[in-house]
Amino acid sequence: MTTSATSGTGPTANSMRRALKRARDGVALDVTEAAVLLQARGEDLDDLTASAARVRDAGLEAAGRAGVITYSKSVFIPLTRLCRDKCHYCTFVTVPGKLRRAGHGMFMSPDEVLDIARKGAALGCKEALITLGDKPEDRWPEAREWLDAHGYDDTIAYVRAISIRILEETGLLPHLNPGVMSWTDFQRLKPVAPSMGMMLETTATRLWSEPGGPHHGSPDKEPAVRLRVLEDAGRSSVPFTSGILIGIGETYEERAESLFALRKISRAYHGIQELIIQNFRAKPDTAMRGMPDAELDELIATVAVARHIMGPRACLQAPPNLVDSEYGRLIGAGIDDWGGVSPLTIDHVNPERPWPQIDLLREQSAQAGFELRERLCVYPEFVQRGEPWLDPRLLPHVRALADPASGLAHADATVEGHPWQEPEEAFVAQGRTDLHHSIDTEGRTGDRRDDFDVVYGDWEALREAAAPGMVPERIDTDVRQALATAANDPTRLTDAEALALLHADGPALDALTRIADDVRKAAVGDDVTYIVTRNINFTNVCYTGCRFCAFAQRRTDADAYTLSLEQVADRAQQAWDVGAVEVCMQGGIHPDLPGTAYFDIAKAVKERVPGMHVHAFSPMEVVNGATRTGLSIREWLTAAKEAGLDSIPGTAAEILDDEVRWVLTKGKLPTATWIEVITTAHELGIRSSSTMMYGHVDQPRHWLGHFRTLARIQQQTGGFTEFVTLPFIHTNAPVYLAGIARPGPTTRDNRAVMAMARLLLHPHIPNIQTSWVKLGTEGAAEMLRSGANDLGGTLMEETISRMAGSSYGSYKSVKDLIAVAEAAGRPAKPRTTLYGEVPQERQRAAAASDGHLPELLPVLD
């Protein structure tokens, strides 16, 4: 079969010879060379596969599995065969009428699923491969009706629920293939499945966009969408299976490009656990029934090229039921895995191709010099890595079946159900719980983690991704005209004018800050507001992988800590005693904390100090709580409000532009999800602050987009209490230590951002706050002359900025904050979280103690 869409006679002898030599010598291939090698046949193919096999063997030896080829003993569970896509080669997908005529429901029932899983467990299977069509409820009313009738919001909710039952009632480990997933879907499913998967298939967009293409009419087969899923899997630290489908009309160049796209993502996140090379097999009753099957040599060459591209550490699989008896050739080409093989169920995607018997695979592997060993659905490397790749709720299930030495399946493991539950003793005080004191006296233990080179992804790939954002823009707009517009009516500033002002310097910047200060005075007057509050960061254990964050620690790190509920309540009581009206509580995404932990924290404070305003839980924490409890964001926020939550911080925003976010953070929520959390909170009457962290890999155009987004949200909901500028603290930030980020914003940046925040958010967000924690007393006073009207809080303790390297301390007294206001020539006034009047009783308590705790030590210079 010829898969090239271009006319031509194939590669020249010289180009093939050069490419083969580079492969033999272990030199990195490019797309052109890979496309040449994909066409190797005869002796050239033998040469190619021999070098690929050597690469594979080196990887197995390095992994401690020399001479081992693996497989997973599984059952195939087709949860639903309905799908919103229309792939032209697919025989798995059907329509509601056919299901009804065959006596089947729109989805398999829980009893049907568990019956298969129990039978599989009895046969020693350890994997439940759950495969289904993409979002069937979006196309088929019958699917929507089934989900509604059974109490599920969507298909993902059913997948989550049935996975828990499989874990608890059978002991099998779910491997989930629900198709295209969102970032939030990954958060929902990660706690219930050790691994997931989705074939990339191809990056050839024309096969999706052009009529007659195999993926035309299938929204979930757009290559850009599928690549985004692979990125989100990596960001979410989900062990993920992917691969390509060959022989569906792609050119050799397109096939090579698909492999390089997979390599790029694998290198960036280290999360692709296996790569499948699947050969097209035509099926009757499909639009592509007349297309010839991919030839065996096509498959062999692609496996070998994939091995060279992906390298020795990659796990490479070719489905054994899609060839006849040529197992030895697949092994010789560089595979090290046979994939899932079931002694019970058929391959529902390729029903005409039965699985080979496991004994046959063992025999064929032995003939090629390999020992066949069983693995779990999650590969041994991830079993041994543990966190953050495996959720703590899954660890007991995985460990019950895994050989602790190799990470492969334990030969004598009993497959039986275990409770799926939160780890015990989630709220036990652990670690450096005095960090709120000692960060100012002793400092942090070290400036970087020992897993610095792997935990945040591939730094070289990040440098490439960050490069476009680091290029300064050329500004041609007349700054003088922009200043005139700002002075006359800042709401009429065009994007071009706003961008020009964000670049202002010298006299133009001075004029800009004066205009912003005038707008501030007209909007909110001269009072500089502040709040007597206490920060309570209840844990710094976090595996999200934010590259700007120096606060997050692994549970075993010297600076890691978690507070008990009693300690949280004690700190709230201490704050109340010295005049606080608010506690601001945030923490790392600790894998051991249940989704209900946030409710418990809010309740603990309210029970101890009923009058305290609970300002807590960033949008990232909201999403974490919702996904861990199985609630929607709206349901979770409603429950949190009932538990005592009064408002939420608008942190985790960083820059509301995913171009920047995915450089700054590996696993934090995307922009759209941040907006969803904030707007949902506002709709429920839960107000929030808004923030922007700037001065890293961003540019003024990103700041402008961020301001415009916040203004739109405020016009829709009116729920923001203030906007807070957060200059990036670079000193201990991983993204700076890796040489990618700038060393924080300049003084010019700070003045321009503050002034433009005032102008671009006017009149929608009247309160603009500066951060003394990040800028110090003089810097904060300068911001008060540039458009700010609020100094934030006394804090009483602060660890996030201090861990990052800020040198301005962990607290300010009331007198300190009044002095900052006076330095700007303005009066100071206390406020509540919602910018209301502070009760006299609270003011008296604050005055008596100066708004800070007596046991706090002075900040060391």
From Swiss-Prot:
Residues the record lists as binding [4Fe-4S] cluster 2: 542, 546, 549
Domain (Radical SAM core): residue spans on this chain: 69-319, 528-763
Pathway membership: Cofactor biosynthesis; coenzyme F0 biosynthesis
SUPFAM superfamilies named in the record: Radical SAM enzymes (SSF102114)
CDD domains linked: Radical_SAM
Keywords, comma-separated and alphabetical: 4Fe-4S, Iron, Iron-sulfur, Lyase, Metal-binding, S-adenosyl-L-methionine, Transferase
Residue ranges, annotated region (CofH-like): 505-838
Binding site for [4Fe-4S] cluster 1: 83, 87, 90
UniProt superkingdom: Bacteria
EC numbers, comma separated: 4.3.1.32, 2.5.1.147
Catalysed transformations (reactions): 5-amino-6-(D-ribitylamino)uracil + L-tyrosine + S-adenosyl-L-methionine = 5-amino-5-(4-hydroxybenzyl)-6-(D-ribitylimino)-5,6-dihydrouracil + 2-iminoacetate + 5'-deoxyadenosine + L-methionine + H(+); 5-amino-5-(4-hydroxybenzyl)-6-(D-ribitylimino)-5,6-dihydrouracil + S-adenosyl-L-methionine = 7,8-didemethyl-8-hydroxy-5-deazariboflavin + 5'-deoxyadenosine + L-methionine + NH4(+) + H(+)
UniProt family annotation: In the N-terminal section; belongs to the radical SAM superfamily. CofG family. In the C-terminal section; belongs to the radical SAM superfamily. CofH family.
Family annotation (NCBIfam families): CofH family radical SAM protein, F420_cofG, F420_cofH, PRK06245.1, PRK07360.1, PRK09234.1
Protein name, entry field: FO synthase
Gene (UniProt): fbiC
